[in-house]
Regions:
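Serine-dependent protease modules
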Residues: 1-239
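Conserved catalytic motifs of ABC-family nucleotide-binding domains
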Residues: 244
Length: 249
């Protein structure tokens, strides 16, 4: 699908980024509900003023952004189609093993629907992209424009969302990354229900309680943690936690 950008906006810095076409960019996505819900990457539609989805038969439909989550790089769109749409099902990504065959679908370089095959090269791969640094590494060729496309197992179930590549040149070198379905399903469910993802947080910084600290505080047992900082306006501050408090359990 494609979206328009205003002239002053820049494209996302994530890889693979949407392939630019003047003031337009393109990416990939997939339908998860016959009513027209579409999953894609957050960086694909970030900054877009108008979003359009092109179906397999060439039908072009305007899309509404239901919600996006930059931390997981996932977004949920909604299109209104005159008929019920065929939808994909999520599979269990936790069953995938190194060497498991996979198929990646997408829209590389805006060329249109393309499929590539490969295997799971690694699981739990971290690439330093944010708090959810737990990717499926694949060798199926993916390129700019594949972002947001589905990664299938041999049963035709979506076990990942293609989201990034490692490449010094910007093109495919056989190292791609997909968000596992185990995470994507939870994020998408939150976006569908609330349009956003609410995350629990405490708002404190802690450090291990050392023997020396315990002795200076008059504590017999050094098992625990000491609060070194309480963030203003945080749940911890509202609960009355203070710097220097010792957490024992």
């Amino acid at each position: 699908f494609k979206h328009r950008r205003s002239p002053q906006q820049r494209g996302p810095h994530s890889k693979p980024h949407p392939q630019p076409h003047g003031n337009k960019s393109s990416g990939s996505g997939f339908i998860i509900d016959s009513g027209g819900y579409v999953v894609t990457n957050s960086h694909v539609i970030d900054g877009g003023e108008e979003i359009f989805v092109t179906l397999m038969d060439g039908t072009r439909l305007a899309a509404t952004l239901i919600g996006g989550d930059a931390k997981s790089d996932l977004a949920l769109l909604k299109i209104d189609a005159p008929v019920a749409l065929p939808a994909l099902n999520f599979g269990d990504s936790t069953t995938m093993r190194v060497g498991s065959p996979v198929v990646a679908l997408g829209n590389p370089f805006g060329l249109g629907h393309s499929a590539t095959m490969g295997i799971i090269s690694a699981r739990g791969r971290g690439i330093g992209s944010g708090p959810y640094d737990d990717f499926l590494q694949i060798d199926a060729p993916i390129n700019p424009g594949n972002s947001g496309g589905p990664l299938f197992n041999t049963q035709g179930e979506v076990i990942g969302v293609n989201t990034a590549i490692f490449s010094p040149s910007g093109g495919n070198v056989g190292i791609g990354f997909a968000i596992p379905a185990s995470l994507a399903q939870d994020i998408v469910a939150d976006l569908m229900d609330d349009g956003k993802v609410e995350r629990a947080w405490l708002g404190v910084a802690i450090q291990q309680l050392s023997v020396e600290m315990a002795e200076s505080l008059g504590i017999d047992d050094a098992d625990g943690a000491i609060v070194s900082e309480v963030m203003e306006g945080s749940p911890a501050a509202a609960a009355g936690m203070m710097e220097g408090d010792v957490i024992l359990s």
